[in-house]
Amino acid sequence: MSNFKQKKITTKNGKEYTLQHPGVRTVAKINDRVKNKHGIPSEEKVCDEMFAHVVVEPKVKIEDFESYIDMMEVANKAYYFITGVDDPDKDKTDGNDQ
């Protein structure tokens, strides 16, 4: 991906985040890193990878979230964004692509 695409999202609780696509090769590497020996993605690893490589503003880590639901909402939206999967929760709270 020559121009790393960004997207602004707004969570259900009103917090705004900027996501940035890290490139196709990095997405493939992330997908490999987050799986356990049985090929099942680890929630903790997915969150760590999304927060390290995709959520660019504000920079966050797992410990910054007060609720599991809020943390997973951001991580899931980031994962949907980089993999090109439609967000099943997509509604008027999502920002527009930039």
Name every feature range the model reports, one short phrase each.
Residues 5-14:
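Short acidic-hydrophobic surface loop/beta-edge motif
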